[in-house]
Amino acid sequence: MFMGEYDHQLDTKGRMIIPSKFRYDLNERFIITRGLDKCLFGYTLDEWQQIEEKMKTLPMTKKDARKFMRMFFSGAVEVELDKQGRINIPQNLRKYANLTKECTVIGVSNRIEIWDRETWNDFYERNLKKSFEDIAEDLIDFDF
């Protein structure tokens, strides 16, 4: 399970350190792809296989299902951690998520998310307008 928030930098070659707390669960190779809200999603290979199976059930007769699958899978790439715990983020994904230098990596249960730090801070501040409790209350019945 992934949790926490970590600030890192993208170097001039498009490499970024993955937080050490995430590396063990991600293993040496994992998948990154376009995520929602202009961030990147990162999945273990096992989790990716499960997502792929779920996506196969989407009706291809629905235009939005086709669009979503195209965007999601065309952006997917398998990355490998180097000896320093870094991954190389391809240019097309850096552009999609507006990653320049300052980045934030967060854990969200079954995935990691890679954000441009300013975009993450804006998202976080914007969503604090609705309190954490209000958001929880609006969700389907869920007990901690």
UniProtKB/Swiss-Prot annotation:
Q: What is the lineage of its organism?
A: Bacteria, Bacillati, Bacillota, Bacilli, Bacillales
Organism of provenance: Staphylococcus aureus
Under which name does UniProt file this protein? Transcriptional regulator MraZ
The highest taxon in the source lineage is Bacteria
GO process terms (BP): negative regulation of DNA-templated transcription initiation
Q: Offer an example of a GO molecular function term for this protein.
A: DNA-binding transcription factor activity
The alphabetical list of record keywords is:
Cytoplasm, DNA-binding, Repeat, Transcription, Transcription regulation
Q: Where is the SpoVT-AbrB domain?
A: 5-47, 76-119
The UniProt gene name for this protein comes to mraZ
Oligomeric form and interacting partners: Forms oligomers.
